[in-house]
């Protein structure tokens, strides 16, 4: 028994001695420099670029490895990417990255320079600082499974600020599977149950592709992405619920079964669509088909109030009651195009085309109706139901509008409208085959309604200065008798 105890004690003493020797050796400059050189060599091969690190710390008792001051430069054809990590800790199968910095520089001016309507996001100018904690659940030669259980990333200048990130990732190095992903940007929360991704391979000629196997869901506050993409959303604090299936490649995106709604469900939208030519801003095409959009009384105005734009005809918008829409819209380079059918409690409007031209700063379009109760829409009881087709053009240039307001004042939009009225009713008068022309300089709107018959032409000129007081419109009638004019010509 004594012999056994001596042997056991000798083995333990030897192990402790070896641990002490290993601990002392590992903490010598020679061993640490060797380990640092080995780690840098492996990272350089993996990243295919020169990697630098200031120092390495190995804790033999806690089984931890810390790398400090890691940095690398990835040179691209158009952009240089700078990567650095203040410290990286390996503890068993857990990895902790502190102050991982990713900086890109394409040596060009920022895309929003001189363009205040554009957001600050620019892939050629990023300065992201991230902290990440992950655990490697499984790692073999041909597969890996890891859990990211804590992550943050911020780029103060662009407004990119992910304050919570976690997900589970599995890969066979040909495909990537992401499960139970959660991302929070400000107050916006995105849940991604599952995404399958085919990783690109130049050698095999395989491109990137991906698709969600279950709908992505989110609670979106558009204000959270305003600095990133468009300052116009800076006041949009109305929460929106989103559900969508997403698929695509590195050059396309497809959105199926889109469901968007407000928390009170007074506004709901169902649609599908996609984006083509992501890599070419000149060919970029965003197209959506709206299967159904419903906006209950007041909800359309509530959404419009979220935008910092001049609000015109808001009273008339309220008169429309519940609004529905079914149609299509496309966003092309410097142009947005809409079409479809708008339903209201006072009648339907066929939106044959509506074009917003960002180059000329004009909105133009063509609309028609067979049953619109125009008087109820405008708040003018004397006008009844109307059947008509109309074309219009309005000026949306801030510069031109500001100049006009300085000179004339006024509360009206600037533009023109021309309509062919098949049938309408004004007081007791029933009108057929009439034409209407209206023009507004922003301060005063003038209109002329002409009703032609075989015997006479009836003309009604009108003026108004405020769309909220249409009932105060001044109307001047005039009549031209054709019969006498015709007889006079025959006599001559």
Predicted stretch roles:
Residues 1-17:
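N-terminal Sec-pathway targeting helices
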Residues 46, 60-63, 95-160, 171-174, ...:
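Membrane-proximal interfacial segments on either side of biological membranes
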Residues 20-105, 118-119, 123-139, 169, ...:
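Terminal hydrophobic membrane-targeting helix
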Residues 1, 5, 85, 487-490:
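Generic cytosolic/nucleocytoplasmic N-terminal low-complexity/intrinsically disordered segments
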Residues 12, 68, 117, 147, ...:
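Structural signature for solvent-exposed beta-strand/loop edge elements and short helix-capping sites
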């Amino acid at each position: 028994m004594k012999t056994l105890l001596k042997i056991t004690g000798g083995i333990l003493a030897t192990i402790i001695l070896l641990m002490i020797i290993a601990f002392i050796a590992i903490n010598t400059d020679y061993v640490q420099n060797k380990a640092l050189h080995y780690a840098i060599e492996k990272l350089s091969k993996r990243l295919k670029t020169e990697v630098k690190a200031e120092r390495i710390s190995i804790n033999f008792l806690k089984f931890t490895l810390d790398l400090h001051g890691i940095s690398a430069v990835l040179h691209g054809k158009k952009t240089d990417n700078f990567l650095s990590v203040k410290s990286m800790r390996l503890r068993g199968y857990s990895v902790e990255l502190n102050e991982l910095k990713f900086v890109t520089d394409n040596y060009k001016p920022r895309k929003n320079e001189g363009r205040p309507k554009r957001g600050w996001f620019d892939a050629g100018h990023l300065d992201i600082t991230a902290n990440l904690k992950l655990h490697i659940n499984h790692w073999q030669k041909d597969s890996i499974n890891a859990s990211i259980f804590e992550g943050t990333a911020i780029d103060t200048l662009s407004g990119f600020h992910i304050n919570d990130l976690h997900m589970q990732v599995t890969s066979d190095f040909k495909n990537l599977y992401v499960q139970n992903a959660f991302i929070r940007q400000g107050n916006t929360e995105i849940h991604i149950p599952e995404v399958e991704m085919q990783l690109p391979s130049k050698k095999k000629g395989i491109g990137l592709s991906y698709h969600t196997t279950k709908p992505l869901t989110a609670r979106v506050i558009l204000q959270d992405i305003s600095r990133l993409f468009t300052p116009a959303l800076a006041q949009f604090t109305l929460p929106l619920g989103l559900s969508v299936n997403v698929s695509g490649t590195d050059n396309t995106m497809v959105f199926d079964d889109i469901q968007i709604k407000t928390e009170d469900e007074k506004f709901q939208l169902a649609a599908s669509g996609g984006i083509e030519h992501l890599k070419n801003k000149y060919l970029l095409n965003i197209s959506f088909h709206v299967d159904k959009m419903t906006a209950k009384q007041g909800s359309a105005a509530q959404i419009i109030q979220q935008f910092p734009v001049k609000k015109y005809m808001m009273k008339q918008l309220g008169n429309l009651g519940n609004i529905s829409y079914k149609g299509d819209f496309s966003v092309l380079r410097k142009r947005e195009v809409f079409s479809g059918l708008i339903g209201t409690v006072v009648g339907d409007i066929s939106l044959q085309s509506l074009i917003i031209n960002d180059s000329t700063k004009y909105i133009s379009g063509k609309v028609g109706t067979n049953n619109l109760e125009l008087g109820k829409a405008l708040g003018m009881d004397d006008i009844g139901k109307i059947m008509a087709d109309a074309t219009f053009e309005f000026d949306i240039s801030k510069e031109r509008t500001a100049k006009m307001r300085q000179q004339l004042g006024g509360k009206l939009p600037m533009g023109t409208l021309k309509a062919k009225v098949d049938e309408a009713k004004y007081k007791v008068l029933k009108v057929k085959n009439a034409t209407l022309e209206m023009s507004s300089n922003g301060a005063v709107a003038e209109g002329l309604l002409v009703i032609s018959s075989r015997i006479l032409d009836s003309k009604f000129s009108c003026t108004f200065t405020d769309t909220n007081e249409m009932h105060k419109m001044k109307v001047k009638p005039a009549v031209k008798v054709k019969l006498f004019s015709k007889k006079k010509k025959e006599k001559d």
